[in-house]
């Protein structure tokens, strides 16, 4: 590895530094803490809403958080939302209208930092209990700007990649569409122009840090914008097969502490 030590490290969470069963290795925690102690800015850049972040604060105890695939800047330490880039109601309604026509079996949920609402036929994987009833049509409750719109094929007839291909054509210029799990038949939709990469670029600019001095890690399509923007970036070897097309390098699987290994090497470089 050549070059200089980065000034900013940005990492996805799930499937990148957090195992699919929820554990974070001590080696990974130690690597991030050491980087932070050396003056490197740390950003955890995730599709998660803030209600899923307490375990990250508890594990690492350092860093900044960009949540909702770039739609929110969140203070891990105080638990406060600092900034949001939300999806307008008209964009939500147009998105639902177009996707219903293109994918008849689709169902929807909508979330902000403090709520999660779903259609009755939308079966949540993780937020069980936040909305036990649901509504017939999500349009009934689309009355406020949203952090993220979720669209699922409950019968899993289409994969997330297949759904994304359709949605990108139907929603071009209206919203940002991505996904974070090729096996879940689930799309994640944000306001136009909102992405992990776009928000990370804003934060770096505020810190007067160039893309060349930033390193990022990610495993799925919602990470690709961040991998593309950073001067050095690593797709996870066990992530989406298209990851290496968008990153400059490949890290070992998260199960082998791939991110920690790279950070340890980066910290040996001159400042």
Question: What spans do the regions from the language model cover?
Answer:
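Mg2+-dependent phosphoryl-transfer enzymes with acidic/Ser/Thr/Gly-rich catalytic loops
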Residues: 3-8, 24-25, 188-271
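Active-site residues of response regulator receiver
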Residues: 12
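Active-site phosphate-binding/coordination module
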Residues: 21-125
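Short active-site oxyanion
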Residues: 39-43, 62-63, 147-148, 212-213, ...
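Short, structured coil segments at secondary-structure junctions
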Residues: 60-61, 69, 77, 171-173, ...
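Conserved acidic, metal-coordinating active-site core of Asp-based
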Residues: 105-217, 221-229
């Amino acid at each position: 590895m050549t070059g200089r030590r980065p000034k900013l490290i940005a990492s996805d969470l799930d499937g990148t530094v957090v195992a699919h069963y929820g554990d974070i290795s001590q080696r990974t925690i130690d690597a991030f803490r050491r980087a932070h102690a050396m003056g490197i800015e740390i950003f955890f850049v995730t599709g998660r809403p803030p209600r899923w972040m307490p375990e990250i604060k508890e594990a690492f105890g350092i860093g900044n958080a960009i949540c909702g695939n770039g739609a929110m800047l969140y203070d891990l330490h105080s638990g406060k939302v600092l900034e949001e880039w939300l999806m307008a109601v008209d964009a939500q309604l147009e998105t639902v209208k177009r996707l219903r026509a293109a994918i008849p079996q689709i169902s929807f949920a909508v979330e902000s930092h403090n709520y999660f609402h779903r259609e009755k036929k939308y079966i949540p994987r993780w937020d069980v209990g936040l909305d036990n009833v649901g509504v017939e049509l999500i349009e009934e409750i689309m009355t406020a700007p949203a952090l993220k719109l979720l669209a699922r094929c409950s019968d899993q007839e289409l994969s997330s990649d297949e759904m994304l291909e359709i949605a990108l054509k139907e929603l071009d210029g209206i919203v940002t569409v991505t996904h974070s799990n090729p096996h879940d038949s689930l799309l994640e939709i944000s306001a136009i122009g909102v992405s992990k990469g776009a928000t990370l670029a804003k934060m770096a600019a505020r810190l007067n840090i160039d893309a060349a001095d930033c390193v990022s890690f990610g495993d799925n399509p919602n990470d690709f914008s961040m991998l593309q923007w950073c001067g050095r970036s690593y797709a996870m070897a066990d992530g989406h097969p298209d990851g290496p097309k968008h990153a400059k390098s490949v890290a070992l699987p998260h199960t082998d502490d791939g991110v920690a290994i790279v950070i340890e090497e980066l910290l040996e470089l001159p400042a």
